[in-house]
Amino acid sequence: MLAAAAAARRHWQGRQRCVVLDTDFQQGQSFIQLWRAFREDREDREDRQDRNDLENDKNAARCERLHVVAMLPTALKQEDLICTARPADDAPYGELLVNAWPNLTPGFHSLSFDEDSVQLLLCNGPVGRQLSELVARVDVFFVHGHLLSDSALADPSRLAKALAKVFARLAAEGAVVIAKDEAASVAGDVALALRKALSDQGFVIEPNTADVTNTSTNNNTITARFVPRFQPKRAPARLHAQLSSARHAVIVGAGLAGSSAAWALAVQGWTSTVFERHSSAAQEGSGNAGGIFHGVIHAQDGLHARFNRAASIEAAKAVRHAIAHDGVAGAADGLLRLETELSPFAMQAVLEGCSLTPNYAKAISAAEASKLSGLRLKHAAWHYAEGGWVEPAGLVRSYLARAGSRSTLRTNSVVTSLQRSDGGWQLLNAEGDLLEEAEVVVLANADDAARLLSTLAPQALAALQQVRGQLSQMPSHTPGLPNSHLPLTGAGYLLPSWKGQTLFGATSNEGDTDSAVRLRDHANNLAQLAKLTQIPAVAELTSNGFQGRTAWRCVAPDRLPVIGGVPLKTQALIDQPRLMARYPGLFVYTALGSRGITWSALGGQTLAAWVTGSPSPIEACLLDAVDPARFTARRVRGLQRNQASGKVAAV
């Protein structure tokens, strides 16, 4: 890995960001060497800066961010990392890595070190599948020779062609590929196949490995640089160009979406200005007294389940930080979701079929669920180990606090309209006065985003719905009111008692515009709570001492958020979201529905990747699933089906 570290060091000189892809994380040795080299380089530059030694150095600007994308063919447990022997100089890095190690589930996992200057994206699963789902612009590729020489894998020639094709898709300008086998030479048919495949995809082999006919060489390293004969065609939605020379974004909305976007952009080194129409942040859907977060388990493990799983893992980290550092009310030590159809045995089979470990979720009996909750439950349950609850407004404040000086909140600022300008985008108030002009704008203002886009992209958010919800709150000592040790959900939800109050709910009424807290909705919430806890008498409790709150959820028909670049109003009949052209510098992050707490952290990170060009924290198929262009793509596919059947429909 020293060769890759040296190549990366050369590549990150004078750059804002360097992205390294490692085809096998192993026990983290390669990552730690890169991390150590990056930190030492930064410290050396700071020392030289203090001595004014960098005055004439054209690469004086230090690299701000090192991104390492590492394939993890086999899930690695924390104890495996602990037992890994490391040189003394690497031990401190190993300890930090162990402490940050996630409970691995299939898919991508993001870790951050050294005040976000070193970011690690772990891709857990078969290498070929994970590479095909990766969205990034890679500067340095490190290929472990055993990936090609392992006889258990496919034919080396076929695999080399597949790898080279993926590398060409991911390669940034001037990217370098380094293939090295630590145990033996990358030679013979394997070397020949890899060199030829790379050459065919626009990589130029370095002179020391240029002889593709000499299979007897003892050189065990192949080095190639990406110099394509023609510019490869990129999917417009995946261009990931930095559109702001100032690396600054204007965000409209200071709820869970807007605040998490500000935090995630700050992690990538960007600044932001957040416009909020109210006098403070989190005054609408994010202003409830409490809410839950957890994953989703489906036997098919489809896009909805996978996105929710990835999001819940990031949510747990965000909530723990908010509790520990910002004094926010909440807990991330478990949640119970009742299962009324499957037996614990069948539930366990689902978990095993999805390769999910107890660290993520367990199937437990009614007796076990009763013990954990303190209630007499009659159904089995999914125990989400990292699920929990939190005060949403507190989480919003935590996101903004983490963005720190990189983000400015402007309250009592109502954005009435949005228009294009030579400088990018102009935000105007009701009088037509200019509030701000920016190259990058993020609309994170729930359904109001659709209004701002009504002229630019009238169909982009037309499918969004407004759903009224009312939650109920009662004194915890109310006779007959159940109290649970853990958050309980299923038909409705029940939060643990907090400061003498118990929160439960909630109603769901599409198209209801009444803002009043209604007694009949309290009654509905009690009936729902009675069904959840299987205590019929709960439904008969009186409304004395009731408190409540109404808010509106912005919901997409497919019950997934909307995150990404805004598609152009008019374009060809394209049926794939990733191929649709976008308005430059205009993004949307909305439709968090009732899962704002669960989705906000990962949603913010996904939005930041769109804006800044950093590696996407989720797979390409999940990007498609939350892409604003998905609604247009579906209409196009519907039109194509109608045309095929002789019908006519409008897009």
Residue map of PLM features:
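C-terminal substrate-binding/active-site "lid" region of AdoMet-derived donor-dependent transferases
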Residues: 151-228
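Dinucleotide-binding Rossmann-like beta1-alpha1 core, especially the glycine-rich loop
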Residues: 291-372
